Swiss-Prot record:
Reported pH dependence: Optimum pH is 7.5 for the forward reaction and 7.0-7.4 for the reverse reaction.
Residue numbers marked as site, Important for catalytic activity: 148
Native organism taxonomy: Bacteria, Bacillati, Actinomycetota, Actinomycetes, Propionibacteriales
Organism listed in the record: Propionibacterium freudenreichii subsp. shermanii (strain ATCC 9614 / DSM 4902 / CIP 103027 / NCIMB 8099 / CIRM-BIA1)
Activity regulation behaviour: Non-allosteric.
Gene assigned in the entry: pfp
Descriptive protein name: Pyrophosphate--fructose 6-phosphate 1-phosphotransferase
Amino acid sequence: MVKKVALLTAGGFAPCLSSAIAELIKRYTEVSPETTLIGYRYGYEGLLKGDSLEFSPAVRAHYDRLFSFGGSPIGNSRVKLTNVKDLVARGLVASGDDPLKVAADQLIADGVDVLHTIGGDDTNTTAADLAAYLAQHDYPLTVVGLPKTIDNDIVPIRQSLGAWTAADEGARFAANVIAEHNAAPRELIIHEIMGRNCGYLAAETSRRYVAWLDAQQWLPEAGLDRRGWDIHALYVPEATIDLDAEAERLRTVMDEVGSVNIFISEGAGVPDIVAQMQATGQEVPTDAFGHVQLDKINPGAWFAKQFAERIGAGKTMVQKSGYFSRSAKSNAQDLELIAATATMAVDAALAGTPGVVGQDEEAGDKLSVIDFKRIAGHKPFDITLDWYTQLLARIGQPAPIAAA
């Protein structure tokens, strides 16, 4: 019998965390009301520190209130249990301690039978490390993860929770920001969208923004011209960017339309930026997982610098939709997937089946409990998809060429 279940949200926010917690509470209350539910605060940091809260009967009775909010009610952090040096530096473990053992011992001390991790590839691969450690040391714990990331880059999962909503919100953000295209003559607007190594979110945001444009009624005779609101360039990490050719093409757009709007993944062009920083002796900032801290190197500003003078921009503006998009409440499309995923996660946990619940691309996208050993990150966006190549053709951008 499962007596106690712990929930944990980790990594960056996505528009699914609060809703996923709500669905897990709902399902456990339906099928195992006697099971105690707790949440570790601030992800793996809370687990290491033994910082948790219990979901009381009052919480379980009003779980539906969580659907109205984004973020995570129990908080997140970026902690990698196998990065001992970072954990010691942050005071989360003592020098000489094994963080996996500290986490495992805390779970046992708290009497936890099941741990649900809600996170992206880093969170779930960290959960896999913990699960492997527990198995080696005969700890009786079942770990069942739920896949969360707005990058939608978890292998082998078709659709991660929150990514659809993030794209919707990014398109909504763009609808307001792009209205600035004629706030000054010859304006260059760069919409920077989250996506470290994967262009999915930038592409899907662009697709949904263009769908919004298609649904509008225009009045060019009064200056309300779709051309000024359109996307003129879309750059993702998976495709090469010919800066010279693009500058020439966008100069023509600027001359004809009077403004230029560029949508980019924050990871687009990063190898060039990093190489440039290293060549000039600058330190490249990284996080606990070894990722380049993109918010500190500002890819959008870099692209603005590359293009502004060459296309004759009178004013340049860089706007980032990332935090706006990732902190939204779940939309209807995501809510349906979250409910199905949480239901299967609870059922798997009660049956003692570990893994990550997701649409398995290697099994016809069937929602399944996927073995932790098969979970990996950095799944690239497929730049050969028909809708994507058609989108680029529509905005006048050459067909994509895969980056090396």
